Amino acid sequence: MRKPFIKYLVSSPDGDIPVNAGMLDVSLECDPYETPYRVYFQSIEEFLKQDEFIPLLHAASRKLDKEYSPRDEISEILIRAEKHGLLYHPASIELILGGRKVKFGLNVAVTDTGKTWLREEISLLQRLHSKYKLPYLPEVHISGELNSFVFLLEDWFEGYHEFHLTCDEERKQKMQLWKFGTGYLNLTDTQGFEIYRQASKILTLYYDPENFNYIYPWHHAAGDFIVKMEHEKNPPLPPFSKGGDTKSPTLAKGDSGGFSDKTIDVRLTTARRYRPLLDFQKNEINPLFALFYFFLHLSLHMRLDKIDGVGEVVWAKDYSVDAAVQGFLEALRGKNYFNNYPSRYEEFIDLLRSFTLDELKVSFNPLLDLYAGTKDLPVIGMNLDKHAEKLYHAIQIRL
């Protein structure tokens, strides 16, 4: 195979930035080792070239549903640095092959901590795909280690973007979709409701009610959930099922979320760990109590973000609670654990409704240890009582 044309790019909100010679000696952001972009890009290139591109061609064959061999030439490869985090330095890999284009995500771990997490994530993604066969997480295509880096080539969710809470000129909270290449899109509360609903549903679908395993950690500030909007200008689907206004949909008013699944679609980009949230002993706790604590944590953690993804910790509006409850219940009703034993679902709903407001507030206390030493904790502390009241109201009215 002839060597394909390979181009290095850096993603930005305004479009791709071609990498010039002067940029190659700049250090990666968020990297304590100060790895130069030159080493980063060249190591990625070496990883992709392994075994004369054969693993990469096999991955392209699976994505394009056509068998490619070493005789088929990759005419061009675009290696695009997408973002930089404390654990990984993700890139996207775009191939031009036989006149067709295919795109992958590539997680790159540089530090010892990042490499430990990525090794675990590779194994976990494979397990979750095997167990649940759901489309919400990226599928592993190639993984390996080279030049002291750990690599994971996985699905790229094309057309999906990060979202974050921000403040307008009047310091009013709003949600924005970060559409890299075209800028930022302001979202309505109705659209935000749908995003939180789907994110909550995804996490619940992957929850293991028998072993109490849960995908965590994740955080909106890290961009772990991403969103695709097919028709950004579409209005809410009228009417809501029971009155209510379109600015801030709630379960109490019977609002369904307002936007169809075809308009907004959510995916989860990572599964770093999969284990019980708290130190539950399987033979010593009722599985429904473990599920109860998953539910509490879901309602709480769904509200946390950082302003513009990097600023101060921010607390999402109340509609996020109703959205989390709706997404949780939708997923719960579809799980075999409850379908095979319908009485379990009713028993769990009775359990939720049995808590008084004061009991519900106290029940959050064990979860606070999860946030010890984080900037999330003070924000949770300031808002927890009102959050419990909102959740209690949603439980009593909706369930």
Language model: regions and residue ranges:
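Conserved structural core of kinase catalytic domains
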Residues: E139-E194
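Catalytic activation segment of kinase domains across protein kinase-like and atypical kinase folds
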Residues: Y214-E232, D261-A323, G327
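Juxta-kinase regulatory segment immediately upstream of eukaryotic protein kinase catalytic domains
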Residues: M1-E76
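ATP-binding glycine-rich loop module of kinase domains
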Residues: I77-R127
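Glycine-biased, low-complexity coil/linker segments
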Residues: K242-G244, K253-G254
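Conserved kinase catalytic-core segment
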Residues: G183-W218
